[in-house]
UniProtKB/Swiss-Prot annotation:
UniProt xrefs under InterPro entries: Ribosomal_bL33 (IPR001705), Ribosomal_bL33_CS (IPR018264), Ribosomal_bL33_sf (IPR038584), Ribosomal_zn-bd (IPR011332)
Organism encoding this protein: Orientia tsutsugamushi (strain Ikeda) (Rickettsia tsutsugamushi)
Name of the protein in question: Large ribosomal subunit protein bL33
Keyword Ribonucleoprotein listed: yes
Family: Belongs to the bacterial ribosomal protein bL33 family.
Keyword Lyase included in the entry's annotation: no
């Protein structure tokens, strides 16, 4: 039997509203708050804030 995975996949959605997203892993036991990164959005050609959303 395989071990149960400790990390979950989360979707980081662009705050610019372009529909661009990144997928990251996080450990819910150690990282209890929502993830938020400043990453590059190629549609806007700028670095914008990406915030966590659920993967459907």
């Amino acid at each position: 039997m395989s071990r149960k995975k400790k990390k979950v996949l989360v979707k980081l959605v662009s705050s610019a509203g372009t529909g661009v997203f990144w997928v990251k892993q996080r450990n819910p036991k150690t990282q209890t708050e929502k993830l938020s990164f400043r990453k590059y959005d190629p549609k806007v050609r700028k670095h914008v804030q990406f915030t966590e959303a659920k993967i459907k």
